[in-house]
A protein has these predicted regions:
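Single conserved hydrophobic/aromatic residue that forms the stacking wall/gate
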Residues: 199-209
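Short, well-ordered alpha-helical microsegments
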Residues: 10-12, 102-106, 128-132, 153
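Short, glycine/acidic-enriched loop or turn micro-motifs at the edges of active sites
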Residues: 32, 64, 100, 126, ...
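N-terminal binding-site loop/beta-alpha segment at the start of enzyme catalytic domains
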Residues: 1-8
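Active-site gating/metal-coordination segments in enzymes
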Residues: 8-93, 138-141, 146-151
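Catalytic beta/alpha-barrel core
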Residues: 5, 93-99, 121-125, 146
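Active-site-adjacent C-terminal substructures of enzyme catalytic domains
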Residues: 57, 112-201
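Glycine- and Gly-Pro-enriched alpha-helical subdomains that act as flexible
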Residues: 95-109
Length: 209
């Protein structure tokens, strides 16, 4: 289980959970919603320091959110790039949040990849196929939440079906987005089995993998 950091000023909380539980790790980052409020949202050294812990396994949640626009877009982008730099230096994957910002997300990932390779995942994917394709082309993973099981998610289901099996991940986004048939309940890691079953049917994929 990975508990996600969304602010540097509160990274001690996911860190404490990871320190207290052998099956929990954490990420360190600034969510795009918080990019305008966090003084160190664009400070690479601050991310390097926050992630300097044996239980930290990723940078993020970072990225762009143009749906709510809680932070200025240029500030979101600057913070995203700073976190990519930290991820590259630490050789940790970056967890990417993308909402209504597909082109800018892909452009930044491709531009930063030209400065030096780094690893990452498009978290809780709900975007257009082109973003998945461009991210996969540079080595990213695409992670699907319980949204994949929703009746309204035909387009996302098609992205999953069209993506290489070795680039697909499944997640909870707990406590939100519980998959069918658990909708309405707090989400939990055990429920990822329902998302996996949707992904593997009707294709002959091995859900155990």
């Amino acid at each position: 289980v990975i508990t996600i950091g969304v602010k540097l000023t509160t990274v001690d909380r996911p860190r404490a959970l990871a320190e207290a539980n052998d099956n929990i790790w954490f990420s360190a980052g600034v969510h795009p919603h918080e990019a305008g409020n966090e003084a160190d949202a664009c400070n690479v050294d601050a991310f390097l320091s926050a992630a300097d812990h044996p239980r930290c396994v990723a940078i993020g949640e970072a990225g762009l959110d143009y749906h709510y626009d809680y932070a200025p877009r240029d500030r979101q982008a600057e913070s995203f790039r700073a976190q990519i730099t930290a991820a590259r230096e630490l050789d940790l994957p970056i967890i990417v949040h993308a909402r209504e910002a597909d082109n800018d997300i892909a452009d930044i990932i491709e531009d930063e990849m030209g400065k030096g390779t780094f690893r990452g995942v498009l978290h809780c994917f709900s975007s257009r196929p082109e973003l998945a394709r461009r991210a996969i082309d540079v080595g990213f993973y695409v992670s699907f939440s319980g949204i994949l099981t929703f009746k309204s998610a035909a387009a996302i289901q098609q992205v999953a079906a069209d993506s290489p099996e070795d680039r697909i991940l499944v997640e909870t986004d707990a406590p939100y987005l519980a998959p069918v048939p658990m909708r309405g309940k707090p989400n939990e890691p055990a429920y990822t089995s329902h998302t996996c079953l949707l992904y593997t049917s009707p294709s002959p994929r091995d859900v155990s993998r």
